[in-house]
Amino acid sequence: MKIAVICSHSHTLYWYRLELLQEFIKNGHEVYGFADEPEELWSELFAEKGITYKQISISRNSMNPFTDIRTYFSIRYALKELKPDKVLVFHAKAVVYGSLAANHLKIYDVYPLMTGLGSVFIDGGKKREAVKSILVTEYRVALKNCPVVFFQNSDDRKEFINDKIINKQRAVLVNGSGVNLDFFQARPLPHDFSFLCISRLIRDKGVYEYLEACRIVKQNYPQVKCMLVGPMDSNPTAIGMDVLQPYLDQGVIEYYGETDDIREYMEQCSVFVLPSYREGTPKTNLEAMATGRPIITTDAPGCRETVDDGLNGFLVPIRDINALADKMIYLIRNPHLLQEMARMGREKAEKVFDSKKVNRKICREMRLI
């Protein structure tokens, strides 16, 4: 069978979904990837893995209706040309316009993967509520013929059911994207205490809270290293260098920019921190667990699934700088807890978040095996 996989961002398609695409191939299917960046940047990389890559016109953050219309027709043209047997879509724009385009071409074997509901589903402001209302309506129309919709956490699944977007029989829960336990192996904790946050630099990921919590930590423990890794972003809530620079100048954090291999930084940290407001299931948390790192994250949809509070890390309230700093300082003062937390995290990754198990479940639900 031909399987089309459509998303908003080529980087995510390759670095976050490659294992799933290879699982499709392993089961005897042809795989075609569609995303935003030019073919000359990605075709060769995908081809080496047995995947055909094509560029489509799609913007992750645009609010322009004309841009969205162009996205719809770009996806429709790609699907009409390919004539796939099944379509997997993820990211909001791809889910809505990919599902609609496929349905209009009488392709009904479409499988949306909800990797998080995005910033509009986070409480805050009339504008977000208005956008959410529009998006809910779009989802209802786009997903009405989908046999299955995948969710990475129970909160997102419940929200879609309560909003009457889909019924619970079609709402399938999977354990995030999973983590490759061979690629991310348990590593010894470092001698010197350090914290690490890996994230796109946007407010909704809790980056500002991390920066301010690090300021409090450094005031009390100036020898502790606080690291930040991740790309700048075009999201409306992006945190730019103008915000970041004072923290760098004052020695609060060390910023390393974007990387395609985070293992080096994971191995350097004692504790991984992600104070996000909402996630699908944060892959960096899973990678930290697999590496054997305690985690401090928020009691938020998607994040809370990754931490058993007090066992492999701690949960803190969303947007609570002081609570975050308190837990960071608590672990600095109680380093004897780290080893057992690290062991529990790796064990949880093996039992719950093994990417092989996650990918097999998706294949079964898509009737590929």
Give the predicted meaning of each segment.
Residues 63-67, 161-162, 175-193, 260, ...:
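Acidic anion/phosphate-binding donor-loop and adjacent secondary structure
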